Structure formats: structure tokens, C-alpha cells
A protein has these predicted regions:
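Conserved HGGG/HGGXW glycine-rich cap/lid loop of the alpha/beta-hydrolase fold
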Residues: 9-83
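Acidic beta-to-alpha connecting loop that harbors the catalytic carboxylate
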Residues: 30, 246-248, 273-275
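Conserved acidic catalytic loop of the alpha/beta-hydrolase fold
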Residues: 91, 95-113
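Conserved hydrolase catalytic core segment
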Residues: 111-151
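Alpha/beta-hydrolase
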Residues: 154-231, 238, 258
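Short beta-strand/loop motif that positions the catalytic acidic residue
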Residues: 236, 242-244
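Conserved alpha/beta-hydrolase "acid-adjacent" motif
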Residues: 249-255
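Catalytic active-site module of serine/aspartate enzymes centered on a nucleophile-bearing elbow/loop
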Residues: 266-296
Length: 296
């Protein structure tokens, strides 16, 4: 475990397994800490013979981002940015976040890796494979999207639940936790039991470990600023696997089909009953899919 220091960011990472093995890099989603790649999931990948790198994206968890005052999130609100994006400059982009992965691999002396991204992390993974094909052995996209604006959108109420909160953990812990749990239940899928006690513990862990310097709106701005470019997909020539839940309410199955149809050499696996989450009951199946794809 440790940090790599970049010009505007400090990226926290942890490594599981031996570094001389095939390396898997796990890329998290929007304002999602590396803790959501649960330790048992990482350990199962290690048992399959892989070295696993987990990290917090910039502005999340233990990773930080610093900027000059002109781009400071406090100088404008998210609503200001959405109404008048031409008047504001996003503090950073999803491509900047993809560059962080390249810097991390370079810092660790890793020549090539298998890149596994979930949700927004899947978009970051696509951009990484697009910009750094020589560093990318395979690309695996879990519950992700190309962000093609023609694809079905999630329900507005669900988006509001994801991007806003009526309170903070510090000001009202019970209400904050309840809102987070209600959102997770809404995206989880109905084929797998939801462990509310475990989710509560993860929420508390995330709040306790995160840096006081992070500003969640900056990642939201990076995502909404992203402009879909089909050439990114068409230019991906690394072996690619898309794994998606057939009950995903955020990125419906059309998003997975779009990825499969537009990325050359791409395979698709649909998981029955899976929503926009990775239940522990699915770990063995997902590990099997990932391992088989990487090693074939």
C-alpha cells in the first residue's frame, strides 16, 4: 500500500498477491471507494493466480486532488455548471483519471495489465485502453456504458438519489446511512439477498477512511462533461469482455449491447438478476468469467 504523488493528485493504492504474476487493475465508479472491490473478491482473484491492484480514484477515499482557485468547486455549484457549462472549466476530466492509471502502472514498474472497470470506472477503463493500448492486455467492463446519449437513461428520481443527499454523515449519521441504503436497495436487483448490516458497515468505513479534502461534485462534473466519441470504442483492439446485469436500472442492458456491438473483439455476458451492484453471491461466477477470459 502507498501513494503516488502527481502534479495535482495523490493516488492511494493497495496490492494483493505477488507482483510477478499477471496483474489486474480494478477501477472504481463514480465517487466509489476501492473498498467496494471487497477484500474477499480481491482475495479470490489472488487465489486464481493474479496480482490485484486496487486504488482510490482522485477525489475519492484516500486519494486527493488539488487545484488552483479559478477551478475550485466552491467557486460555482453543480447546478451552475449544468446550466452554463460554457462559463466554467471542469477541474479534471475522465481522461485525466485514465492518465492516473497510467501513472500508477509506471510508478509500480508494471509494463502491461488487465484493466477491470465498474460503472463509471468502465468508461475510465475504455479511455485508458484507447490512450494506452500498449499497456492494456485485456479490458473487462462491469455494469458500464459508452455514455452514448442515444441509449436509455435512468429514472430521474434514481439519479437524484445517487447524486444528492439531504444531510451529511457528520450532521445526521442515521439519515445519511438510510439514504445510502435506500439507494443501494433500488439498484441491487431482486435475485440476491441484500445484507443491510454489511452495507451499513461499508458506509461507515468509507466515511471514516476518506480524506477531508475530497469534493464529490468534481467527479460528477467530470462525468457529465464527458462527450461520447464512437471512435473511442471503434479504436479498441484489445480483447474486451462486457459483464452486465439484466436488472441494471442505471445502465440498462442496451448499454451493454452497445458496447458489444461497437468494440471490436468484444464478448458479452449477461447476469440474470444482477442490478447495478456486485452481490457477494456472484463473486465466484464473476471470478470464473474474468479468469477464463484473461487466461484463454
Amino acid at each position: 500500500m502507498g501513494y503516488i504523488e502527481l502534479k495535482n493528485a495523490a493516488i492511494y493504492y493497495e496490492i494483493y498477491g505477488e507482483k510477478n504474476r499477471e496483474t489486474i487493475v480494478l477501477v472504481s465508479g463514480l465517487n466509489t471507494q476501492m473498498t467496494r472491490w471487497e477484500l474477499s473478491f480481491c482475495n479470490q482473484l489472488v487465489e486464481e493466480g493474479f496480482c490485484v491492484i486496487c486504488f482510490d480514484n482522485r477525489d475519492c477515499g484516500k486519494s486527493t486532488f488539488t487545484t488552483d482557485r479559478s477551478n475550485d468547486i466552491h467557486s460555482f455549484s453543480l447546478n451552475d455548471f449544468l446550466r452554463h457549462p460554457e462559463k466554467h472549466t471542469a477541474p479534471y476530466s475522465l481522461m485525466d483519471m485514465a492518465d492516473d492509471i497510467g501513472d500508477l502502472l509506471h510508478s509500480l514498474g508494471i509494463q502491461r495489465a488487465h484493466i477491470v472497470g465498474r460503472s463509471m470506472g468502465g468508461i475510465i477503463a475504455q479511455l485508458f485502453a484507447y490512450k494506452y493500448p500498449a499497456l492494456t492486455k485485456t479490458l473487462i467492463l462491469l455494469m458500464s456504458s459508452s455514455f452514448n446519449p442515444a441509449l436509455p437513461k435512468a429514472d430521474d428520481a434514481l439519479i437524484r438519489k445517487m447524486t444528492s443527499s439531504t444531510t451529511s454523515f457528520k450532521d445526521n449519521k442515521p439519515t445519511f446511512i438510510k439514504e445510502k441504503i435506500d439507494f443501494m436497495k433500488a439498484i441491487y436487483g431482486n435475485q440476491f439477498s441484500f445484507n443491510e448490516e454489511k452495507e451499513c458497515a461499508l458506509i461507515i468505513e468509507d466515511e471514516c477512511r476518506k480524506s477531508s479534502l475530497i469534493k464529490p461534485f468534481r467527479q460528477i462534473i467530470a462525468l457529465v462533461s464527458y462527450k461520447y466519441d464512437p471512435d473511442v470504442l471503434h479504436s479498441l483492439h484489445v480483447p474486451t469482455l462486457v459483464i452486465h446485469g439484466d436488472q441494471d436500472p442505471l445502465f440498462r442492458t442496451e448499454h451493454a449491447v452497445d458496447l458489444r456491438n461497437n468494440i471490436p473483439n468484444c464478448e458479452l455476458i449477461l447476469k440474470n438478476g444482477m442490478g447495478h451492484a456486485i452481490p457477494e453471491a456472484l463473486f465466484p461466477s464473476l471470478i470464473k468469467d474474468i479468469s477464463a477470459f484473461i487466461t484463454k
